[in-house]
C-alpha cells in the first residue's frame, strides 16, 4: 500500500494502526519482529514508534534507510566504514534514479555472463551432449532476475538430471569410478554457490565502468551514502548470497519522498517476499532530483498486484 497525504493528514497514525490490525488479525502469520519501520532520521523514527505501545504493540524494529541497507550487507559491512548523508549539489543525482539501478542490473548480467559457462556441455568419453548452449541460454533467460547462486543451482540441477539419465542409459556403460568422477566434476561445472569476493570491491568495479561511460560518480573511500549502500546491498543479494536469511515480512516506510527510486528498486529485490506500507507527500520533497517528485515509478514498481492499493488522504484525521 502507498499512502499519500499532507503533513496534517496523520499518515503515520494510520500506518501504526495498520500494524496493530495485522498483528491482531493475523497473529499466526506475523509477529512484531516481522515488521521494520524505516524513516529518514532517528528523531522521526522515535516519534513514530512512540505510538505503538499505546496500541499494545512491542518489539517492532526501527531503522533509517541507511541502517536497513547496512543490515542487508551482513558480514560484508566493515565496522570501520562510515555512513555519509546525500549532499545536494555534491552527490550525483543520477545515483538515486531508476536509470542507475538499471545500470547496476546490467553490470550484474555482464558479470554473470563472464562467470557462468555457456557452451555445450559434452562428455569427453562419448561425445554425448548433456546440455546444449541453447538450453543453457533458455535457462539463464528464465532465471534472469534470480541471484547468481540460484542461477547456478538451477543449471546444476538440470545438468545433473541429464547426467543421471546418461549414466543409467543402455547405449554406453560406465564403471563406478567413472560415474563418481563425472558426478564430482559436473556438480560444480557452472560454479559454486559460495562466492568469496568482496562486495565493496565489486561495487568499485561497477563505479569505474560507469566512469568510463561518463557518469559523474566517484569511488567512495570508506564513506557511503544511502545510494551506495543500496547498490552494495543489491550486489550482495544478487552476486554473493548463497543462503537466504530471513528478514522482515512487512516494511513500513515513512517520508517516502526523501528517497529516490534506486533505494526502492534495491529494497524490492533484496526483500522480495515483503509487503509494504509506504507513506509520504511528494509535495514535501525538498531534495529536488534526489527524492520522489511523483508516485508514478514507485507505484509501477511496488504495486503490481490486483489488490495493491494507492490511497490519498483527503482530510486530516488529527482531530477526527
Per-segment meaning from a language model:
Residues 12-22:
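Motif I (Walker A/P-loop) of helicase-class P-loop NTPases
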Residues 23-252, 257-266, 274, 306-312:
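Alpha-helical nucleic-acid-binding subdomain
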Residues 270-320:
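Conserved RecA-like helicase ATPase core segment
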Residues 3-5:
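Hydrophobic anchor at the beta1->P-loop junction of P-loop NTPases
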Residues 20, 257-258, 283-284:
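Catalytic acidic motif of RecA-like/P-loop NTPases
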Residues 8-9:
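Walker A (P-loop) phosphate-binding loop of P-loop NTPases
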Amino acid at each position: 500500500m502507498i499512502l499519500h497525504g499532507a503533513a496534517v493528514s496523520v499518515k503515520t497514525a494510520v500506518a501504526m494502526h495498520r500494524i496493530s490490525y495485522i498483528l491482531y488479525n493475523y497473529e499466526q502469520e506475523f509477529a512484531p519482529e516481522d515488521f521494520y519501520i524505516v524513516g529518514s532520521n532517528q528523531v522521526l523514527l522515535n516519534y513514530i514508534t512512540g505510538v505503538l505501545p499505546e496500541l499494545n504493540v512491542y518489539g517492532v524494529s526501527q531503522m533509517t534507510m541507511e541502517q536497513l541497507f547496512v543490515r542487508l550487507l551482513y558480514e560484508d559491512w566493515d565496522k570501520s566504514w562510515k555512513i555519509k548523508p546525500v549532499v545536494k549539489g555534491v552527490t550525483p543525482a543520477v545515483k538515486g534514479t531508476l536509470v542507475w539501478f538499471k545500470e547496476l542490473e546490467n553490470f550484474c548480467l555482464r558479470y554473470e555472463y563472464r562467470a557462468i559457462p555457456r557452451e555445450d556441455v559434452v562428455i569427453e568419453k562419448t561425445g554425448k551432449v548433456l546440455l546444449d548452449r541453447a538450453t543453457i541460454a533458455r535457462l539463464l533467460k528464465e532465471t534472469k532476475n534470480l541471484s547468481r547462486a540460484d542461477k547456478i543451482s538451477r543449471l546444476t540441477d538440470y545438468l545433473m538430471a541429464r547426467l543421471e539419465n546418461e549414466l543409467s542409459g543402455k547405449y554406453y556403460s560406465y564403471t563406478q569410478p567413472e560415474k563418481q568422477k563425472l558426478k564430482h566434476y559436473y556438480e560444480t561445472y557452472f560454479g559454486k554457490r559460495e562466492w568469496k569476493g568482496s562486495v565493496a570491491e565489486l561495487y568499485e568495479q561497477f563505479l569505474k565502468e560507469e566512469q568510463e561511460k561518463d557518469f559523474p560518480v566517484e569511488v567512495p573511500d570508506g564513506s557511503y551514502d544511502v545510494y551506495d549502500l543500496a547498490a552494495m546491498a543489491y550486489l550482495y543479494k544478487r552476486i554473493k548470497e548463497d543462503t537466504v536469511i530471513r528478514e522482515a515480512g512487512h516494511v513500513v516506510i515513512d517520508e517516502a519522498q526523501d528517497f529516490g527510486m534506486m533505494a526502492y528498486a534495491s529494497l524490492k529485490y533484496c526483500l522480495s517476499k515483503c509487503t509494504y506500507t509506504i507513506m509520504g507527500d511528494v509535495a514535501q520533497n525538498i531534495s529536488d532530483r534526489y527524492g520522489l517528485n511523483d508516485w508514478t515509478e514507485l507505484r509501477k514498481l511496488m504495486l503490481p498486484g490486483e489488490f495493491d492499493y494507492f490511497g490519498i488522504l483527503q482530510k486530516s484525521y488529527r482531530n477526527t
